């Protein structure tokens, strides 16, 4: 991320409108970034199935799992949730009401145009995917419209 460039879209209509968004300049939450350690999978299995089918915000999720573990978490959550749950794909547009999980061994980032990006850059603080990488990029894109949750 280049410090010289602004990651904040310019102008009143620069951000997509929709559920959870505010076109009047308010600080409405428009996305939720969620980070979890391996031990917090049980909490995710309780939290996400409790969301209603019409949950209006995108959920951007990083779970620290062992590098050699094949992740079936997205499939497991999808079978238990009323919202859509999927592994994030590179360059995928972020949609309301969808939970995106970082694929195993990839950093998950939010681009300024509200698309997802996957990176195989070096681990950050021994982790890939890294909660820090997701939170920093999502905060750059959403600003005060981002809520962050860390489960331990």
Question: What name fits each language-model region?
Answer:
Residues 1-152:
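Conserved acid/base catalytic micro-environments in cytosolic active-site loops
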């Amino acid at each position: 991320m280049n410090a010289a460039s602004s990651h904040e879209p310019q102008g009143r209509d620069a951000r997509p409108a929709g559920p959870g968004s505010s076109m009047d300049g308010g600080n409405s939450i428009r996305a939720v970034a969620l980070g979890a350690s391996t031990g917090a999978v049980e909490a995710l299995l309780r939290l996400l199935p409790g969301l209603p089918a019409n949950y209006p915000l995108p959920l951007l999720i990083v779970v620290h799992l062992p590098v050699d573990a094949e992740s079936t978490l997205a499939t497991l959550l999808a079978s238990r949730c009323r919202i859509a749950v999927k592994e994030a794909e590179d360059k995928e547009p972020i949609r309301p009401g969808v939970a995106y999980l970082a694929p195993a061994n990839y950093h998950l980032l939010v681009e300024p145009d509200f698309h997802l990006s996957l990176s195989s850059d070096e681990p950050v603080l021994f982790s890939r995917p890294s909660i820090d990488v997701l939170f920093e990029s999502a905060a750059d894109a959403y600003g005060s419209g981002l809520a962050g949750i860390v489960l331990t």
